[in-house]
Amino acid sequence: MSGRRAAGARSTAGDVRLRAVRLIAFRGANSVAANEAGAILDATEVLMHELLGRNGLETGDLVSCLFTLTPDLNAEFPAVAARRMGLSRVPLMCAQEIAVPGSMTGVIRVMIHAYSDDRREPVHVYLGETAALRQDLHGAQ
């Protein structure tokens, strides 16, 4: 769907009816047990699978992904896990969260920009200890 503004649905008469598609941001986070490459990659992969699955997103829907890590996590780029999942044509970026005193450590966050059916509301996914970050979201786990 990348680059398309509307998706067509064929009726039985053969005409094409268009439905609106919009660009939506999907948010999520996961906690990481240790500053180790394997732990960061595993937590990122679980987070991405959950976000994509719960929102019915496919690789072709994705526009970009922005990953952030808390300052205590620097053993690996989360984008490596996304590439291993097959997101080879999706622009990915990694950055460090600001070090706010007293904030939760050991956290990977992601914001996925994707095209989605207009009727669908985004399901934001917060796994592990990060569920405490956004208790206000119905989609938070």
What are these regions (language model features)?
Residues 1-141:
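Terminal domain-initiation and capping elements
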